[in-house]
């Protein structure tokens, strides 16, 4: 397998020939697949009987210059997503998607940056509010993409070359394949076969409702080979950040899609943050450049996400279930499940009067086990799954996540007060998509009598210590001075300078 190279530098490979066109009679559409394996024969049988929709109205989008292109000769009804020549010249068909199309689209791009100096496409896009919002818009517009994790989801430790699960968010808006170039191919085949297997009436209904891809996601996850019983869907086993290809059960996915009727579609739900304490203050409670001055990545929709930046020991969110849908009007039960995180440090308190829960997450000091995925994997994300249940089927997943920056080593006292934060300890990893490198250590001071915060002292190798007051001002003989923080975009180091 060829390694994936950096996005925006060079494509890994170019120019596979376009798929040949079907040469059948104009009034007789080709079958949905030329595959002759049992799944291919089954799909063509359904199509000939009129119970499978095939790929009419579906487009495929390859965004890596043909490096890992789906073989469209296997799917003669599937149309390559059209681009104008001017769009191709402008590379609008290359790299991360940049627009929400009106067509029904699934696609891929086997492109990535390295784990340390860059990121995979999903990690890059899910690390900003704008990126997550764009992915949500795609997902709810009948568009689904597959991207390899490359170096962003591999076990770390002695004798291992990986860095753990580096994703701040587990984005259900797309599919992440475990591996590098070509690892996306089995997923493209499975998605193509699933999309063609829907009953025509059901598929058109989902297309109009803009809910086709959430149902495809639900089918993929409920059909995974490791799931042995219904309740397994409510565990991390069904929701790894990146999926191994050998977990796919293509036939099961096809049969699940084929069996759906307008009244047996899986339920739907979304989330919204209802209450939250005042956010931490940049330059006082945490330190980042202008583009990273918020803890919030998403407050509503399919994902609620926070980057834990402020020095507080605990985070609290009250999240409400909204926009539920049950196609046959059946009652819904809502499940709130801790998928990742120390259960002694996470509480989920459900309301007795409203469809909401208050979630409290205390500081997690070390790597967080990532159960359910590949063995030996850990990360830095606490994750809660929220699912609607109609008694027969579960909804596609919604996630609430809290990400703890791996380049921070914090010490708290027994009451939860911050005592010290070391940003430059040996082996620390600064995720350039989320934080800057900070070559210092902060030790916090408190009034001995009242316990009120007095400020902190910043130590950096080769420099004199710098004292700050509780408002983040540098203490100088002539008086306190306000500072501003800037990130050097080349070195990714944070510096503090006098505010103008």
Q: Model-found features: residue ranges?
A:
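Long, solvent-exposed N-terminal ectodomains/accessory regions
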Residues: 22-187
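Short beta-strand elements bearing conserved aromatic residues within extracellular beta-rich modules
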Residues: 334-336
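Short, solvent-exposed loop/turn segments at the edges of extracellular beta-sandwich modules
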Residues: 389-394
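Acidic, Ser/Thr
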Residues: 320-328
């Amino acid at each position: 397998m060829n390694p994936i190279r950096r996005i925006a530098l060079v494509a890994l490979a170019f120019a596979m020939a376009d798929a040949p066109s079907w040469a059948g009679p104009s009034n007789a559409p080709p079958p949905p697949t030329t595959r002759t394996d049992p799944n291919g024969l089954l799909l063509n049988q359904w199509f000939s009987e009129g119970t499978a929709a095939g790929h009419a109205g579906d487009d495929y989008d390859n965004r890596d210059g043909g490096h890992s292109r789906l073989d469209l000769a296997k799917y003669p009804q599937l149309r390559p997503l059209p681009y104008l020549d001017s769009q191709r010249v402008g590379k609008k068909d290359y790299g991360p998607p940049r627009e929400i199309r009106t067509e029904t689209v699934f696609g891929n791009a086997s492109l990535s940056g390295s784990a340390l100096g860059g990121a995979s496409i999903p990690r890059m896009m899910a690390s900003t509010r704008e990126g997550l919002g764009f992915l949500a818009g795609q997902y709810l517009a009948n568009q689904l993409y597959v991207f390899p994790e490359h170096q962003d989801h591999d076990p770390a430790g002695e004798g291992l070359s990986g860095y753990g699960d580096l994703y701040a968010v587990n984005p259900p808006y797309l599919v992440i394949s475990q591996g590098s170039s070509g690892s996306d191919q089995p997923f493209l085949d499975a998605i193509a076969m699933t999309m063609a297997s829907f009953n025509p009436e059901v598929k058109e209904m989902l297309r109009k409702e803009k809910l086709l891809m959430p149902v495809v996601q639900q089918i993929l996850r409920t059909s995974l080979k490791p799931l042995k019983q219904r309740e397994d869907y409510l565990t991390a086993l069904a929701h790894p950040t990146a999926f191994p290809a050998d977990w796919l059960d293509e036939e099961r996915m096809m049969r699940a899609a084929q069996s759906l009727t307008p009244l047996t579609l899986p339920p739907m739900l979304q989330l919204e943050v209802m209450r939250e304490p005042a956010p931490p203050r940049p330059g006082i409670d945490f330190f980042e450049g202008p583009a990273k001055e918020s803890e919030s990545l998403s407050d509503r929709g399919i994902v609620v996400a926070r980057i834990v930046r402020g020095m507080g020991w605990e985070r609290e969110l009250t999240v409400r279930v909204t926009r539920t849908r049950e196609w046959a009007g059946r009652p819904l039960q809502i499940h709130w499940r801790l998928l990742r995180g120390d259960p002694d440090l996470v509480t989920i308190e459900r309301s007795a009067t409203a469809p909401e829960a208050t979630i409290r997450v205390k500081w997690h000091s070390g790597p967080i086990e990532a159960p359910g995925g590949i063995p030996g994997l850990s990360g830095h994300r606490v994750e809660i799954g929220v699912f609607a249940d109609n008694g027969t089927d579960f909804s596609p997943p919604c996630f609430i996540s809290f990400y703890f920056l791996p380049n921070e080593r914090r010490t708290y006292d027994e009451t939860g007060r911050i005592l010290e934060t070391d940003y430059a300890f040996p082996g620390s990893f600064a995720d350039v998509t989320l934080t800057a490198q900070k070559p210092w250590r902060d030790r916090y001071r408190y009034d001995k009598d009242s316990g009120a915060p007095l400020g902190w002292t910043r130590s950096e190798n080769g420099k004199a210590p710098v004292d700050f007051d509780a408002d983040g001002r540098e203490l100088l003989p002539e008086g306190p001075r306000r500072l501003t923080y800037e990130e050097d975009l080349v070195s990714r180091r944070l510096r503090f300078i006098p505010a103008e």
